[in-house]
Structure formats: C-alpha cells, structure tokens
Regions:
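Generic anion/oxyanion-binding catalytic loop in active/binding sites
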Residues: 5, 31, 86
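The tetratricopeptide repeat
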Residues: 1, 35, 42-44, 49
Length: 263
C-alpha cells in the first residue's frame, strides 16, 4: 500500500516525545569526549521540542478555505490540534518541557557562563556575553557544541555575515531588523514604542537627532543587545565598524524618500 495515511500532528509529537524519552533512558550521564551527546543533551533537546509542541497545540490557528489542517483523503488532522484536544495536549507538552529543563538544571552539570560578568557593570556584562559564544574552555553553559576544525570541518558563517568593513567575499547576508532591536531596553522611543530618531513624535516629523558619534545612540542599550548586534561605530575584532544608510548633512526637516517612511 503506497498510500499509508499520515499520522496526525499530535501523534507525531507523541512519537517525538517517546523517542527522546528512550534516548534519555539509554544514554550516559556524561559525554565520552567533546562534541558527543549524553543524557542531558537529550533532555535539553526534549525540552526545546516539547516547548515548541506545546506552543503549536495552544496557539495554532486554521484559516477556513485555505488551511484546514485536515488531509483531503483521510480527514486526519496533519496540521494543528483538534478543538477537544489542544488544551490537554498543550498542558502535557509544556509540563514535559519544564520537567526536562528542570532535570538539566538540578543535575548541576551545567550553569550560566559568568566568567567576566559583574553586577551593575554593563561593559563587563557585554564582554561576558561575547566571550560566552567563543570560549570553549570549560564553558559551563555549553550543553552541546558542534566543533569546526580547519580545513576538514568548516563553515561559511563569517563569510556570509561579516560587515563590509572586513571585505569578506559574501558578507552582510544577514542584518538585524529594527523591530528586533526594539525588543531591548535602553533607547528613547516615540509614543508608539518605535525607536526615536527625530525630534518629532514620529519618524516623519521634526529634525534628525544629532550625535557626536554613532555609538552615542546606543550608549544606554542593554549589554546583551550589544553582544548580539554590531552597532555602527562599535569595535569588532579590533576594527571600528562603519555602517551607513545615507548621510544627513543639513538642518532641513525629515523628507521621506518613500510615501511610507515607517518600518
């Protein structure tokens, strides 16, 4: 039979849960060597998967006539959860996510990376988070790490994402968006919550706010944001990063290039 009915989404997540539980049962508590899995790696992945499953169960929606979630031949719900099942399923998956994460925490094997962290010191907190991603020497926060070694096991992440300052062959492929930056504290804002860049009540009103240095705009930004995003004028790998989106030279009011200047 080449037309075996697909399992429902709930059945699929239940199988994922069972597979993780079996892996947790069979695996050792410690990795035999760096880069290998162990019981707590499986628990961490299980927690992440069950958090996603619980979110799908609780928040999924269907669009009538466009996305029903039901197979046309079998009527099996292959997308989302039935109305009489989502509450129970989401509670089950969220509980499994919590239990798995709690077991990892209570094991004492892993902990937050705080080698350079210091209370009330934004610069130390920023540097601590930067180092967290590159310090592989006894980093207590690393649960599972995929290691790369030149020339046998490499990646092209830097080539695709480095700023133009470094003249990488494929750089600037990924840039953070303004709405991502808006998720963090430390900025002046318009009444609607967006980042304030002019003297008016919106980005289409008033004059641009002027700074002596591009970094002045970010001086109060959360340390973790600075660790995630390279700001114009910040120093990265020993170089000052120049990022421009045009140069404003006059005192004239803002004149949008397009009819809608918002982002």
């Amino acid at each position: 039979n080449l037309e075996v009915p697909r399992a429902s989404e709930e059945e699929t997540w239940n199988q994922v849960l069972a597979d993780y539980d079996k892996a947790i049962e069979l695996m050792m508590s410690s990795s035999p060597k760096s880069g290998y899995s162990n019981k707590y790696v499986a628990l961490a992945f299980k927690s992440e998967a069950m958090l996603y499953a619980g979110s799908v169960a609780k928040y999924n929606e269907t669009v009538t006539g466009r996305l029903t979630g039901l197979g046309t031949k079998t009527g099996v719900r292959v997308i989302g959860f039935d109305e009489d099942r989502w509450q129970e399923a989401s509670k089950k998956y969220f509980t499994e996510a919590y239990k798995a994460a709690s077991e990892v925490i209570k094991s004492g094997v892993y902990s937050l990376y705080k080698k350079k962290w210091a209370a009330n010191d934004p610069e130390a907190q920023y540097q601590n988070m930067v180092d967290m991603f590159s310090d592989l020497s006894n980093n207590p926060e690393n649960i599972y790490v995929k290691e790369y070694v030149y020339p046998t096991s490499t990646h092209a992440y830097d080539s695709y994402n480095l700023p133009l300052t470094f003249k990488a062959p494929l750089n600037c492929g990924v840039c953070p968006t303004a709405d991502f930056v808006e998720l963090f504290d430390g900025f002046d804002r318009y009444p609607d919550g967006t980042l304030k860049v002019t003297t008016g009540n919106s980005c289409t009103e008033g004059n641009y706010v002027m700074y002596d240095s591009p970094m002045d705009y970010y001086k109060n930004a959360e340390p973790r944001l600075r660790a995630y995003v390279i700001f114009p004028g910040d120093v990265f790998k020993g170089k000052e990063i120049e990022i421009y989106a045009g140069v404003y030279t006059g005192a004239a009011p803002v004149k949008p290039l397009l009819s809608d200047y918002s982002y």
